[in-house]
Amino acid sequence: YYFRFDEHRHTLVCSDRLYVQERIAGGPVLFSAQPEGDNPQPVLHSFRYSENVRTARQTQRDYSFKRPTYDQEHHLAGEALEHQGSSYERYDYPGRYKQSGAGRPFSESRLRGHRRDARVASVSGDDPRLIPGHAFALEGHPRADFNAWWRPVRVVHRGTQYAGQEEESADAPLGVSYDLRAELVPEDVEWRPAPLPRPRIDGPQIATVVGPAGEEIHCDEWGRVKVQFPWDREGRHDEFSTCWIRVAQNWAGADWGHMAIPRIGQEVIVDYLDGDCDQPIVTGRTYRATNRPPYALPDHKILSTIKSKEYKGSRANELRIDDTTAQISAALMSDHGASALRLGYLTHPRPEGGKPRGEGFELRTDEHGAVRAARGLLLSTEEQLRAGAGHLDRGVVVQVLEAALELARELGDYAGEHQGVGHDA
């Protein structure tokens, strides 16, 4: 940046490009190694040039969940690599871009920032025409290759106005003095400052899921949600509080996995990939005073459950597991029609025991029911302890039928002996 001074106003000019800047007016800047104050016109009296071995190649990668198989890798080589290590590579991940089209400009800017002082000159003098970004031609240096075009990237002006005689003692310095210090790069170098470190988030944060008024679930095609952070003073707990934020699920496969979208009002835990404040992700959910667990605790601490809530309603679906000692059970239930499949020790959840309803299984509903099996259906009261055979095994049933057949034969024979009707088989 630099200041432009006019008669009626002063302007602060900021730019992210050097090559679009002007050249200074008034001809070349002169160099003279004479001591300060011994030159009749403004000059640069000190010129120190240095070269530093810096990054010669920049490689960057990044990741986007929208294109997970594409590495978004970009390679750029520096310019003017004389006296440099051409194999000196810097590899950065993440590259701070999510679209490949932005990758090259990011990589280019990063490389230039790392090479900002690969070729640099430090000067001092009293020519006030030096302005950051404005090129000038240097003349008068004993090394001909230094008499070239340069651009200042940093200028420090220092001026002093000493007090008058009436204010200080007779031996106090009088008049004014001015000098400057500047850093220069060759005019053809598109200079960039050092890359700034990315602000890092120290650990996860708590937030509340938000969305439009009247909604209970608000997400996009990726299952992302929006949240309101407790520290946010500007948000209004609506769909504009944050950007879309990804949600971690227990399973996530190709058309398979677990899916449970955080609902508006739920408290969630938000973490940040690589500590990057621009890459939040919901990693968990927590209960709180306004969102209590499905069953009172610690009374029902032996229960494990997955219980949903009817969208814009009050009913629920639930998969419940009861691990009560010697009375374990599982149940799959829906409030619609009071439909349920209960397995094991049949009873309702209870903190201090309850009246048993039976043992085994119960499939029931207040609505209609149907059992269909295209390839056969076996209903039997014969035991098959611990599922020791195939689920359609009919060995025991055949034995019963054979015993019944034998009994029928015996009864037939007995009837024939006593003048009854003979049997058919």
Predicted regions mapped to residue ranges:
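Amphipathic alpha-helical and helix-coil boundary elements used as assembly
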Residues: 1-425
